[in-house]
Amino acid sequence: MSLIHSEKYVVLYNPISNEGHLDSWHVLFIKMLTQAGFKIIALTSDPIALRKKLYDVDQTVGSTSAQALGQGLIVLGAEPVGLVQKFGRRLSHYSTKTLDVLFGRPKRRVTHLEPSMLGQQLNALLVRYPEKIGLVLNMYMDAYDPAPEQWKHFRLKTVVPLAGVCITPQSGYSEGYYGLPFYRGTCFLDDTWREAYQAKFTEKYFEYLPDVTDTRLPKTPSALLQQILTFARDRKIVFMGGSIGKQKNLTRWHQVIAASDLEQWCFVQIGRINRNNLTEGDEKSLTLQARQPRENLFVHDGYVEDERIFNEIISHSHIIFAVYRDFTRSSNMLSKAAYFEKPIVVSTEGVMGKRVNQYKIGLCVNPDMTQEIVNGLSTIEQIANLQDNFRLYRNDFSLEMVQAKLVRFIEQSVGTLG
């Protein structure tokens, strides 16, 4: 059974909105699948933001017109089911928080979403659109508690194929959702993971998706870019951005800034700082920066909702800093580097180091060696054949390739439902 030009919908669910990577991919997936002939229900916790990203001022998204999108696209908000449940959850959250304060309990950090919530949201959708859902693709299976007991009682009112995207597998093949007979498979951003999981779960279907990115630019220069260019003057701009937590290696970033020539280099940091996810060294660096702001560091501590502005800043930078700590997976920053032809400096570890070494689009450095990173900034633009290297990377990590793989994955997932 094919869902292309079918009356049934593919549900694309992004469970965590206002996170750059996922928001970007949600829009790209909608565009790709609509162009391929699928009808889409886009489920999100922030439908207003998604609509804003989909429909530009000129009412186009890429080469897909707003009219074409409207004919095959429904955008819905994912909300708790029912007013009583909403009230109960809010009351429970308030009570727990109040008791924690009164009795001095340590703060509880939520690390995963509950599979039961996913089940409630999907069942509400199945009731609203009976016999109209052909497949559900969850954009971030990493977000859910992988423990088998959490998935033991997961049920859907109507059995439909369920599949997902997994950015960072963490459970050693023990994710509970693989025990669901209607869970058909997973897309990974690393082919090594695809091969490993396919060997483990031969009855499921797995696909590798190149980590591509939105590369659109605004029609007119943004106010944020103007501020940065004024601040930078004639200095070379080193860009670091995205959701900023401990993996961004803030401690080393600040040390590199301190060790660099004030008159030659300007460092630009764009993105919301996740202060609940920093190392002690990161916190000390931020405290020092607040007390003694560096003359060569521009900081925008906030989520840039319009990715075109994020891209615009990269396009005016000279080098991308992505020397992440304990970060083994892919990053769409590599695709941004290749598309905007900006050499990127990364850590030697993980998928990013492997790809930069393979395609020669930047340098790999030790994430703990400040001087090695500083030296790399001075030599990175001397890499031979950089433009050809960028072109090769773009060919292998193209939107067309992702679209073909995604379509194949969906068709296979539907076709293999027993």
Predicted feature locations:
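Short hydrophobic beta-strand element within catalytic cores of glycosyltransferases
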Residues: I319-I320, E341-S347
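Donor nucleotide-sugar binding/catalytic pocket of nucleotide-sugar-dependent glycosyltransferases
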Residues: P161-G172, P181-L224
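A short, glycine/small-residue-rich beta-strand->loop->alpha-helix junction that serves as a flexible
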Residues: Y13-V27, Y144-D145, K248, T328
